[in-house]
Structures are given as structure tokens and as C-alpha cells.
Amino acid sequence: MQLAMIGLGRMGANMVRRLIKGGHACVVFDMSPKAVADLARDKAVGAASLVDLVRKLEKPRAVWLMVPAAAVDKTIADLVPHLESGDILIDGGNSYYVDDIRRAHELAPKAINYVDVGTSGGVWGLERGYCMMIGGPDAAVRHLDPIFKTLAPGAGNIPRTPGRERIGGTAELGYLHCGANGAGHFVKMVHNGIEYGIMAAYAEGMSILRHANVGEQQRAIDAETTPLRNPELYQYELNLRDIAEVWRRGSVIASWLLDLTATALTKDPALTNFAGRVSDSGEGRWTIKAAIDAAVPVPVLSTALYERFSSRGEATFGDKLLSAMRYDVGGHVEKTAG
């Protein structure tokens, strides 16, 4: 099957490579000519512009966008004048599901199909495959099934869920048509919110282990320092690298994210290459908003998001104000760091 890919970053480029390896024909475009040339060497057909890309596609055209969420509307606006009834636009990035609903409505008068795909797999997807959560009209999704099947990881060696043989479907192959437009990105949005929470749990747990030697450290004796009453209970010098590794082997918290944690700690146990400023790309915020609208309590996911804000210094003013209030209330002098 033929597919166009716009956006040849880490994920887009590797998705093209996986599709070519699976026997599909890919036409590619990116703002970087080098990115296009690199994939042309891997047997993709390069395009010099969006117009050139559309001209090289057979009808009905299938065009996959793998661009930042902020660039999707502009890219669609540039493409639409060159597309025709029956063509399919796929947004495989991390767009807000509300925008998917709007875009599908705007494209409907031109009979251009819009499909949203929440794509998980990151830089590992070339070899492992991509988990895909899909939203859009049934006919368009069915037409794209050969693409999804190639990109997906397949059943692999994951044991089948008991009773799954009676259900069937594509979910156990790693891709799922979740529902109408927006459903794919809605499910991916919550997936990423959960990811925030899991990552935060590992980070907090490892931080406790790292401070299990606090009893060996000298603590200031003053009104601003909480005394450690039983320092003899905190005398452990724990090897986080090895703990992460042993947890990978049969523990109930084993996961791919723990695998990556173990890899990071093996490369650099002190994590000296990281400052601890954790970004968020929007999905966590949207997840919390959906939870508020539906009156669903999500304390773990919301706390994980707020901690990302705090890591970037977003709480600095509030923390300063807390110190100011403590000083005015009781004359508490702020301690210096270190």
C-alpha cells in the first residue's frame, strides 16, 4: 500500500522505515531536505513540497501527518486545496482530541476523511512496533488496516489474556479502532496521563532509596530543621542500579518504563547529565481537564502533572511567598541551600 508521511522526526522517519521494510511504498516530505534525502536512501520517494507529494500519490490518497500539534492546522490548510473527495488525512501526533472533532467537521464538506491516531512506541518503535489508538470513520480505518498492521508490534511473545480467544479483534496485535473522530487521541491522552503517574511513582520511590543513608549525615540543630530522632534506622547505602535491575526480574512493578529506568541508572548512576527540569507536552493537562469535566477524581495523575510544573521552577514565587509568610508569622529565617 502507498502512504505519504509528512514530518520525518525521530518517530516519523522510523515509521517510514518500518513500513518500507513491510513492503509498503512511502512518499515523504519534511522541512529539512536532509531528512528527506536520508529516507530516499532507504527507498522512500522524496517530495520537494506538499504539492509535489500529493502529485506522487495514487488515489485515494493517504497522507499521514507526524508533526507537532501546533503545526497540524497549518499543514492541513496547506494540503486541503490539493486533496480530493475520498482522500484520507491521518494525524499520528499528540493532538488534542477536541481539535480532531473540529477538523473532521471542517473536512466533511469536501468528503476528505480524517483519522486520528494516538501513537505510542517512541524511538523504539522501529524494532518493537507502535501501539496505536485510532479514531475515525469505519471505512477509512478499514482502508488503512494494512498500514496499521505493519506498524503495530503484533501479538509477539506476550501471553494471551485468558478468555481473549473468544473476543478476537486487533487489540492484541497492538492497534485498536477506539471509536469516532477524537477517540484515538482521547485514549492516547489518558495513556500519557497514566505514564506521568507511573514515571512519578518510580522517581519518588527511587528518591526515597537514595536517601536511605540520611542517618549518616550531620543535621543542623536549630529551629528550622526537623530533627531525625532515629538516625540509626537510616544507615543504608543502597545501589539503585542493582535495585532497578532486580525489580525487573519477576517483581509486580516490572514494566518497560522500569527497564528504561534501569538502563539510565546503569549508564549514569548519579544522573549527572540531567538537571531535573521535566517538560509536559499537553496530554497530562488535557487528561486532568477531562477528569474535571467528568467529575472523576485523579489525585495521582494531577499530582504527577503538578510536580512537572514544580520541577521547572513554576512554583518558585509561591515558595518564596511561603518563606515570607513564615518570617512574618514567627520570625523564621529562610535557610540557604546546601
Stretch-by-stretch model annotation:
Residues 1-62, 86, 123-126, 327:
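NAD(P)+-binding Rossmann beta1-loop-alpha1 motif at the extreme N-terminus of oxidoreductases
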Residues 2-8, 17, 149, 156-189, ...:
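NAD(P)-dependent Rossmann-like dehydrogenase/reductase catalytic/cofactor-binding core
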Residues 26, 46, 89, 113-115, ...:
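Hydrophobic beta-strand scaffold residues
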Residues 27, 128-152, 188-196:
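Short beta-strand and adjoining strand-loop segment in the mid-core
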Residues 51, 63-79, 96-99:
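Beta-loop-alpha module in the N-terminal Rossmann-like domain of NAD(P)-dependent dehydrogenases
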Residues 85-88, 92-141:
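Rossmann-fold NAD(P)-binding glycine/threonine-rich loop
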